[in-house]
From Swiss-Prot:
MF terms (GO), sorted A to Z: large ribosomal subunit rRNA binding
Designated name of the protein: Large ribosomal subunit protein uL10
One GO cellular component term noted in the UniProt record for this chain: ribosome
GO biological process: translation
Domain of life, source organism: Bacteria
Gene3D superfamilies given in the database record: 3.30.70.1730
Quaternary structure note: Part of the ribosomal stalk of the 50S ribosomal subunit. The N-terminus interacts with L11 and the large rRNA to form the base of the stalk. The C-terminus forms an elongated spine to which L12 dimers bind in a sequential fashion forming a multimeric L10(L12)X complex.
Similarity field: Belongs to the universal ribosomal protein uL10 family.
This protein's UniProt keywords: Ribonucleoprotein, Ribosomal protein, RNA-binding, rRNA-binding
Function: Forms part of the ribosomal stalk, playing a central role in the interaction of the ribosome with GTP-bound translation factors.
UniProt xrefs under HAMAP family: Ribosomal_uL10
UniProt cross-references to SUPFAM superfamilies, sorted A to Z: Ribosomal protein L10-like
CDD domains: Ribosomal_L10
Originating organism: Mycoplasma mycoides subsp. mycoides SC (strain CCUG 32753 / NCTC 10114 / PG1)
Classification lineage: Bacteria, Bacillati, Mycoplasmatota, Mollicutes, Mycoplasmataceae
Length: 165
């Protein structure tokens, strides 16, 4: 008698894993990677690892089962071809941003859809998510907006001081 479990039990475990990853991820991106070389996929994985982003390749049928279980049936039409699933653990946009930036240099990778704030977004929506500023960019913009009035006041004070001299 063999030690291997039935295939359907292994598949059920993978579906549970996918459900768990989707639930715990801040954001999910789905990209088609047809014709992407192993070297390029490795490069993408290395970039993802640096940003605490998980990249997984699952059978679309298993992701379909997980999507149905989570009530994300709008995701099902995007589960065709060879897909890679990118799970962002830090914030909701970094998965989409990673794929969009990588796809600019690698036409074999195409951003297809994603899950943003618990909702399925199509290709247009996930590209919009990818174009949003990151947390660091937002902090920088906020700090600049706080400093602007102070800089303006300092310039006025310097102008007055120079006219008195």
């Amino acid at each position: 008698m063999s030690n291997s479990r039935p295939a359907h039990a292994r598949k059920a475990e993978i579906v549970v894993e996918i459900v768990s990853k989707i639930k715990s991820a801040q954001g999910v991106a789905i990209a088609e990677y047809k014709h992407l070389t192993v070297a390029k996929m490795t490069e993408l994985r290395v970039q993802a690892l640096k940003q605490n982003i998980d990249i997984k390749v699952y059978k679309d049928s298993l992701v379909r089962r997980a999507a149905e279980e989570l009530g994300l049936v709008d995701l099902i039409p995007f589960l065709t071809q060879q897909n890679v699933f990118i799970f962002s653990n830090e914030d909701s946009i970094s998965a989409a941003k990673l794929v969009a930036n990588f796809a600019k240099k690698n036409e074999a990778l195409k951003l297809k859809a994603g899950i943003y704030e618990g909702k399925v977004v199509d290709t247009v929506g996930i590209n919009e998510v990818a174009s949003l500023p990151s947390k660091e960019e937002l902090y920088s913009m906020f700090a600049s907006s706080l400093l602007y009035p102070l800089r303006k006041a300092m310039a006025a004070i310097n102008a007055v001081a120079e006219t008195r001299n």
